[in-house]
Design a protein with these regions (language model features):
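Generic alpha-helical transmembrane segments
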Residues: 694, 739-740, 764-779
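Transmembrane alpha-helix entry/boundary detector in multi-pass membrane proteins
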Residues: 759-763
Length: 861
């Protein structure tokens, strides 16, 4: 069909239809979307949810025997809420993300069709279309050039090459022929026309995109922890319940004479009674509020992180960022502003006006307000001119361009001949060594210029020299020396230091030269000294061990690469495969790795890392492969994400502490009640209030606690560390046993004091006291992991205030109006005051403990 195409007329409508039918739309097939029902069922893979489902099924069997379904309904509601909340938020984020990526397919593209040049959406480009490209355009499909003028293309998104000169002749030493253009690359200079040879998945970027969606088997730290917790709970619950069943049944067989008779129905009833008690123990051991707490925490963080420029695509990424031990970051755009700027301009000879004229006319760049169109270096010069109050367009009107010689890698300079004010000038700008050689300079002037240039180059700046020549002059006159830089983002050095103080190693992986990479590393604080720095083992390590090039890295065997991986701080001249290999080696060391990337070539590394961080300005393939998108492209957002992740994990620990204290106390009360022969002092409806409603409220209160900068002073937790630390476990047992002792003593007192057992009024006291103990313990849970007072920032914790109010109001309503349904009787104001005052000791003991810890820490300092 290509032979029938006239490059002047382009395709006809009929030919467009035929081509589309044969080769398809110009759209990259997104990763296979999981169906909604599969996405929802995936939430049931959570180990805690699975234990809850088993408990719910056992509870359902017992419910049919006892004709009481409240406990069963409660567990099923807890499971449904936890899974549905997680499903909703993850689906909501996915929809937002797909809207963002779909917009990119609507970018307008100029094509020749039916003898006219028209604009069509990128998705409608077909094979054999004649496409027109110019400065600032993104190439919409793969193709072969038909014509071009000074065409330079940035292929870094695909090949890593920042600038490639194109020509109609094939060949060249690059990865692709010089007459080939590739989808997703950017036109930085010149213009051209090409015939489309591949669209959609058949393009080079389409092939890379397919690789970046391969499944990986890296388990997130949180999933591993919940797995371990589920295993522990199921083991402890099973051991306690089996032991209780054997002990109580054995005691009954030894002491109850009925076992010597033939009343088998009564014996079966006793066995069933003890079995039901054992099952109740298992159900009580499972923290049914935990999945809700996890999903609420992740979902709330997801929403909040969006406000701080982090679009989280996958829920687990919120928490995994808190476990990160290594960040492998790009330089351009993340550490720097990705906006070339003139740092220093040294005027040598000639007037300022003549220099301004040279900058305005000897260029191929344009400005769209403050946005440069064309070569970034030339755009920086025009922006400098604008900042000085000069309009480059007006300056161009003051002269007539006679001829222009574009920049080329062979010549390394650009020249423009103009007629201005009746005088003819030749303006030249380019590589300093080339321009200086053309100038009339004595040794002293040349040496001074070379020293100035060397100083700029040591600071990782790009240098240019300007010169001019009047028609009657024999040699050129050095006009100016310019140092251009892609400045660091102002917030980056502080953010890097924040990460390093938090025990996170920051590694820079860049395509820049070793000298530039080293200078940037010094500026952002990756390197402390010029010669030696502290290595991964805490010892002083030579600089050559901490810096490596992509070529050197590739030459290392897997064994050598494994040994070197942790000590590397900067990798220069790196390619995408180098970054992916570094991630793999660090993961082998047990590191939790986050990776930033903006190009399609970064997609595999983003996909294989524990957390892939794409840039908002990056390619759609990079975003698709990532877990989180930095909307502002800034490294500061990464540091914020780490803080959010660590705070989230701390909040989950706080909830676990609160939840398990309730469970331990309730578990012991079931056992204790069985020992003294009384029925469970809390009814099923009361347990539902304590276990489900209060747990949900607690999840809301603790999940909504704002992130704290304090967590950034700690070292990253090990992926192998159990979510329940030793001190936390001791606190759970101490509080749980203390609450049990208080409640059990009260129960025994009431049992022995009354003649007809414990009456409803006393059981209302018991129920309210139990709830108020948990109420005050919520304050202790809030302060877990910190020696700070539980009242610190209390007025800012609106979620906590609301929950405390709801618990108090809910308890009062249940006690006052619950009646037979909740087996309660109203309490007087005096009784409420006694219960609230006495149970508040839980908080004051906690405050005293934290005050002592604070004093001890101050003494150590």
């Amino acid at each position: 069909m290509a032979k029938e195409i006239n490059s002047n007329s382009g395709l006809s409508d009929e030919q467009v239809g035929q081509s589309r039918k044969r080769c398809g739309l110009n759209v990259l097939t997104p990763p296979r979307r999981i169906s909604l029902w599969k996405l929802y069922l995936d939430k049931y893979r959570d180990p805690i949810i699975q234990i809850l489902l088993v408990a719910a099924l056992i509870s359902l069997v017992l419910a049919f025997i006892e004709h009481n379904f409240m406990e069963t309904i409660g567990i099923f509601v807890a499971v449904f809420l936890a899974t549905t909340v997680g499903f909703y938020f993850e689906r909501d984020a996915a929809k937002k993300f797909h809207i963002l990526t779909a917009l990119s397919e609507e970018q307008p593209v100029k094509v020749r069709r039916n003898w006219r040049v028209i604009e069509i959406p990128r998705r409608d480009v077909v094979v054999d279309d004649i496409v027109l490209i110019e400065v600032g355009d993104e190439v919409p499909a793969d193709g072969v050039l038909l014509s071009c003028t000074d065409l330079q293309i940035n292929e870094s998104s695909l090949t890593g090459e920042p600038m490639t000169e194109k020509s109609l002749e094939g060949g060249g030493d690059g990865a692709y022929a010089r007459n080939v253009v590739l989808r997703s690359t950017m036109v930085m200079n010149g213009r051209g026309e090409f015939r489309v040879t591949a669209v959609g998945d058949a393009t080079e970027i389409g092939k890379v995109a397919a690789k970046s969606t391969e499944q990986t088997a890296v388990k997130t730290p949180l999933y591993v922890q919940l797995d371990k917790l589920a295993t522990m709970i199921s083991k402890v619950g099973s051991i306690v319940s089996v032991a209780a069943f054997v002990l109580f049944l054995g005691h009954d067989i030894l002491t109850n004479p009925v076992w010597g008779g033939k009343d088998y129905l009564y014996m079966a009833d006793l066995v069933l009674e003890y079995f039901m008690m054992a099952v109740t123990l298992i159900v009580m051991a499972v923290p049914e509020g935990l999945p809700m707490a996890v999903t609420l925490s992740l979902a709330l963080n997801m929403r909040r992180m969006l406000k701080s420029n982090n679009l989280v695509r996958k829920l687990h990424a919120c928490e995994t960022m808190g476990a990160v031990t290594v960040i492998c970051t790009d330089k351009t755009g993340t550490l720097t502003q990705n906006q070339m700027q003139v740092d220093t301009l040294l005027l040598k000879q000639g007037s300022e006006h003549l220099l301004h004229l040279a900058i305005a006319v000897n260029t191929t760049a344009e400005l769209d307000n403050d946005r440069g169109i064309g070569n970034p270096t030339e755009s920086a010069l025009l922006l400098w001119l604008k900042a000085k109050g000069h309009d480059y367009a007006e300056l161009r009107k003051q002269c007539t361009v006679v001829s222009q010689q574009p920049f080329s890698t062979e010549r390394k300079y650009m020249s423009t001949r103009v007629l201005a004010g009746g005088t003819q000038y030749l303006f030249v700008k380019g590589a300093p060594e080339i321009v200086l050689a053309k100038c009339d300079l004595d040794d002293k002037e040349k040496q001074k210029a070379q020293e100035e240039l060397a100083d700029f180059q040591r600071k990782a700046m790009r240098t240019l020299a300007f010169a001019y020549q009047k028609a009657e002059d024999e040699k050129m006159t050095l006009q100016a020396i310019v140092a251009i830089t892609d400045p660091l983002r102002k917030e980056v050095p502080a953010a890097v230091q924040e990460c390093r103080k938090a025990g996170i190693e920051v590694k820079m992986v860049t395509g820049d030269t070793a000298a530039t990479a080293f200078e940037i590393g010094k500026q952002i604080g990756i390197f402390e000294e010029d010669n030696t720095n502290i290595g991964a083992d805490g010892e002083m390590t030579p600089l050559e061990v901490q810096m490596i090039t992509g070529e050197q890295w590739e030459a290392l065997s897997d064994e050598e690469a494994y040994k070197h991986a942790q000590n590397i701080r900067v990798m220069s001249r790196a390619r995408p495969t180098d970054k992916q290999r570094l991630v793999a080696m660090l993961q082998k060391h047990g590191e939790v790795v986050a990776v930033t990337g903006d190009g399609t070539n970064d997609a595999p590394a983003l996909h294989y890392a524990h957390v892939g961080l794409s840039l908002g300005s990056g390619t759609s393939v990079a975003k698709e492969a990532s877990d989180m998108t930095l909307l502002d492209d800034s490294f500061k957002s990464i540091a914020n994400a780490v803080m959010w992740g660590r705070s989230l994990y701390r909040n989950l620990q706080r909830f676990l502490f609160f939840q398990l204290v309730v469970n331990v106390a309730a578990l012991l009360l079931v056992l204790g009640g069985s020992i003294i022969g009384t029925e469970m002092p809390l009814t099923v409806t009361q347990i539902l209030w304590v276990n489900l409603i209060m747990d949900t409220f607690a999840a809301l209160a603790l999940a909504s606690l704002p992130p704290s900068h304090e967590v950034m002073k700690e070292k990253p937790r090990k992926a192998s560390d159990f979510i329940i630390s030793r001190s936390m476990g001791a606190g759970i047992l101490f509080c749980g046993i203390s609450f049990f002792v208080v409640m059990f003593a009260f129960l025994v007192y009431c049992e022995r004091r009354g003649r007809g057992g414990v009456d409803t009024h006393e059981l209302t006291w018991f129920f309210t006291t139990f709830v108020m103990l948990q109420f005050w313990n919520l304050f202790n849970a809030k302060a877990l992991g910190s020696n700070r007072s539980a009242f610190r920032h209390f007025l800012q914790d609106k979620g906590m205030q609301l929950v405390l109010l709801l618990v108090l109001a809910g308890q009062w309503l249940i006690v006052t109006f619950g009646g037979e349904m909740f087996r309660t009787q109203p309490l007087s104001l005096k009784e409420w005051a006694i219960i609230i005052g006495s149970t508040s000791l839980v908080l004051w003991v906690g405050e005293l403990y934290r005050a002592v810890r604070r004093a001890m820490c101050h003494q150590e300092e």
